[in-house]
Each structure stands twice: as structure tokens, then as C-alpha cells.
Amino acid sequence: MAYNDLRDWIAALDRAGELKKIRTQADPILEIAEITDRVSKSRSARYGQGGPALLFQNIKGHPGSQLLINQFGSARRMNLALEVNSLEQVAERIRGFMDVKSPQGFLDKVKMLPMLAEMGKFFPKTVPTGPCKEVVKRDNFSLLDFPILQCWPKDSGRFITLPCVITRDPRTGKRNVGMYRMQVYDERTTGMHWQRQKVAAEHYRDAIRNAATSTAHVGTAALGGPAGQSPAATTAVDIMAKTSGASVPAEGAYPSGKMEVAVAIGTEPALTFSAIVPAPPEVEEFLIAGFLRQSPVELVKCETVDLDVPAHAEIVLEGYVNLDELRSEGPFGDHTGFYSLEDQYPVFHVTCVTHRKDPIYATTIVGTPPMEDGWMGKAVERIFLPLMKLTIPELVDINLPLEGVFHNLVIVSIRKSYPGQARKVMNAIWSLGQAMFTKCILVVDEDVDVHNLGEVTLKVLNNIDPERDIQFTLGPVDSLDHASRLPNYGSKMGIDATRKWASEGFTRPWPDEITMDATTKSLVDAKWKSLAKDLGIE
């Protein structure tokens, strides 16, 4: 049965022995982050088990508040979050839906009815009200009432780090739920870290184009018109609105040059996880969450903006971003293990806060791995492998090592059947959504275990001729890549570590790998139990 809300999830963690309640006073400025970092890198975490989820119940400056962190910080908790014994179960369900063929006749259509009925259960549904409306504050509110963390010494302030940020495509009306950090500037404003390749940033650019062609709120001045235009407005267009191609037709323009935004904090785990998944463009994250939890997400209307939010969220922030306003955001200690640099981003103005009575603030900390976000990334890797195979059918397995921080290294094994196939796979990966940011791709043969980094290292270094097998290309890179020649643009490397064929220009014989013959292995197998005991290596 799906978790109804964050509190159901916390109770499940407690029952499973995966939660530790911390009653010792801890400061949201740096101290809670340091405690969590030590837990994330504890002995159990290093051996792949992950430290426990933490519920802080005595937070300095916030009497009576509770804070949940590291809720996804182990493989077991990711399984618990999605209510499966193994993430392969989710992948198998995805494969099942992908295997559905177009019906060829009446009988085929009848056979599809149960599948269609099941899919219908996942769509979100709007309800009149929900727990997130237990307290409604249209004024007399402050973001600083919540125990928002400053995680690292050189962070530019407190950051909301686990939000579900809800926007709407001004062209199509489709909703998006994304996870973007939010620097708290004061009691009622935050930054919106919408990196330019993200969906919400595209919504923002579309809103600017619409407003520029259909209203006077942005108009020619915002597009570099008369002198006296505010630097913020000019910068907003320069950084966020410049795209190739013609302007979008004026439709669905936002009134007064504003774009409405809502933020849900403390949602049930499937929805929180859905905010980070690389969803196909036509699929809403609310639907993905319904699929993962096997039950629809309940939504309620906001009080001050025309958006729907999760009815069972602990906290909801409603508001808008001005289309001509940017503000300095960062530095921020990021998942790369380095501080992401200060830059200009849109500003979120909060118009209303709703929350549950005694809301539980859910957050996370990112930094040098292993940390909580790494386990979430590994779940994405496992669950979405079947979708990658739709585009790359020769793909056998994939590994995004934690040390590669998701976008620096991808290791794939392939079923090779023609010359140059490894390079084809590299280019296919660089064309797949967020995988376009991958800095380095290693391609190995299907018999290599991509999750065994020792085996991968051995095969890669033995199988390559560097000049022949390393490919360089240029393209988009992650905004957090501090080493690229330019922001958002740099080089990538692909390494073909597959066995080389004569049809690929390799004229020498390829040697056999060293393995013991089956007869000898059987003889030793019969003696091994006794030998191992004598040798003390059972």
C-alpha cells in the first residue's frame, strides 16, 4: 500500500530500523550537515549499507520543529521508498508496459483493457482540500521559521535542497516537477537555480518570449531597447531568454511579466524521487509518481497561483518569479565535492505559505560522495535502464559510479555485432536527455561486469590503444563542471575498450583470456570446503 505522506514514510522507516531520532540539540547552520556527512561516510555507508535516516527533534532556534535528512541514503531505503524488494521489480514493470504492442484487431484491443485500466490508476487526481492546507498564511509568514540548512562554510546562505518545484509550460500547459536548490535571501524571497538546460528554465524562457511579444510588461526594453533599462532586466534576457530560432508565438503569456511557481517540501518518497528522474518530455512527474507508488497523487489548488500541489505535502510555498529579475546565487557546496560558483538566477517571491500543523522539514545535503543523492542516482540508473535500451538495444548494463558524480563517468557494456558499434553507442548516450552532459563514457564488452571497477579497469587498460580508441568531441556540459573551457560547453571523451576486430582495422591476433579448465575446477571444487577451512579463508 502506498505511503500516504511523509509521516507514513517516517513511520515505515522507524519500523524497519532505518531511522534514528536525534534529541541532542543541533544547529541548522553547519552542525546538522556535519553530523549527516559523518553518518553518510560511516563504516556501514562505506560498505554499501548507508547510514540511517535521521530525524532531528531538537533544532537550535526552532523549538518544536523536526527535520528529516538522509531518508534515501541506502540501497535498502530506496527499495523501501518504492515499496519493492529490488529496484529490478520497478524496471520489470517498465519493461512490461514498453512491451505492449499496438492492437491489430478486436481481440488484441480486449486483451489490452486490463493494462489500460492499470495505467489509468496512476493519473493524478484533484481533491477539494488536504493536510497541506491545515495552516494557511497569506501574510505574516517567514521562510526563516523553517529550519533551513546552511550546509558548508562557504555557502552563501541557507538553501532549500529537497523541494519539488512545480511550473507550467506556457505553450502547452503541461506541468513539470523538478528539484532545484533555492537560496533563501530573506523572509519572502529565494533564488531559483534553474540551470539553462533544465525544464523549468525552458518554461522561464518561453514565458519571457511570450511576454515580450504580447504584453508591455517586458516589451522592447527587456529585449535590449531604450537606454535606462535596468541591468537586471537586460541580464535576465541575455542569460535566460537567448535561444536559437524564432520567438515563440504569443500565447499563454504571464500577466504583469510574472511566471507562477509553487514549491512542495516534505512529500511522500515516490513523488520526491520523481522530481529527479529524467522523465520523457511528454510524461508528467505526477504520473511517474503514481506509477511508482501504484496509486494516484492527490493534488489541491493553490491559494494565490493557478497551480496544483500535492495535497499531503508538509509545506507548500506559492509565488512567482519576475521575468526581468535575476540575482546573484551561490556559492554552494555541491555534489561534485566542490563549490559551484556564484551566478545570476531568477528570484522567487513567496506570496503564500501553507503547511500541516507542526510541519516536518525534509532536506538533504550534497557534497563529496558517498552521500544520499548518490543512492537516488543509482536508483535512477537501475530503473531507467529499460528505457535506455529502447534507444540503444545493444546495451547490456550501465554503471554510474558515485565517484563520477552522475555526469562525469558512465560505464556501459554492449552486445557488439558490427565494427564501430562502441562509437555509435557513445554518440547515442550523448543524445539522451541529461546524459548529454556525460564527460567520459567507457564502453566494454558484454562479459565485463560494469559494477566491478577493478574488472573494468583491467579490461579498459588492457584493451585500448589510446590513439586509436579514444574519441574526443565537443558539446553541452553540466553547469556545475568547473573545469570546462566555457560555462555549459566543453569537451567529452569516449573510450572504446571492446575487443577489436579485423573489420575495425585490427590485424593482429587477439589473445585468449586466462581461465582454468573445467576438469581441474571440478576437482578443486570437491576439495575446496575442507581446504578453505584449513586455510582459514572460508
Identify what each model region corresponds to:
Residues 212-256:
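Intrinsic disorder/low-complexity segments
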Residues 1-211, 255-332, 336-538:
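Extended, highly charged
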